[in-house]
Amino acid sequence: MGLGARCVVPEANNSNKEIKINPNIIKESIQMVKYASSKNKVYLAILGISWFWFIGAAIMAQIPSLTRDTLGADENVANLFLAVFSIGVGLGSFGCSYIFNNKITTKYVFIAALGISFFGIDLYFASHIASINYAPEQLKSISQFLSKSHYWRILFDLFCLAAVGGLYVVPLFAVMQYFTSPAYRSRVIAANNLINSFFMAGSTVILSLLFYM
């Protein structure tokens, strides 16, 4: 699918033919981040995107534990959660072009962030209520899981959280690229990916410390 999508992406021209490749990866990475941080709107967008990946990494990491230890369900239910989350992000991202009418705007980013918080909190309470019926001697299958109405609330929260996440992050990506000079755009995107990875790693470290405590 990725290769197929690549084939229909319009070819981009070289915006800076005089660019020199620095073989020192660390030094060049620092320079890319410095340049990105010097552009206020761009850097704020990158931080917002990184926060999205921070939360996303935390949620994805907790799904196996949530499924088995809290809800008492098997790995097929965990796969269902992952599928629902992925579909939600995809639909939310796809819906941006219709909701924003193909305009670059952060008008609803704050509302989407509130939506992530709301559905995240409700997911916690829904999971807590559902855990009351946890039977440790037998893990629930998908059919058993879907047969109870209170489990559908968990799926709904997870889907909506992912969907508003898509509505949140896509406008920030658009802002990051729009306010970056074409000559630096690819390097700013690389800097964004680097900062994203640090946030995701930080999410993993924090979760590990909380688990240890």
Please give the residue ranges for each predicted region:
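C-terminal membrane-cytosol helix-exit motif in multi-pass small-molecule transporters
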Residues: M1-S15, L123-S127
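A late C-terminal transmembrane helix in Major Facilitator Superfamily
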Residues: F179, A183-F211
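Intracellular juxtamembrane helix-capping segments at the cytosolic ends
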Residues: G166-T180
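A single, central transmembrane helix in multi-pass transporters
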Residues: K34-L91, V109, A113-S117, G166-L167, ...
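Helix-to-loop junctions at the C-terminal end of transmembrane segments
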Residues: L91-Y108, F211-Y212
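Loop-to-transmembrane helix entry/capping segments in MFS-fold secondary transporters
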Residues: E75-N76, T106, W152, P182-N192
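Juxtamembrane intracellular "pre-TM" segments in multi-pass secondary transporters
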Residues: E11-G48, T70, A135-S147
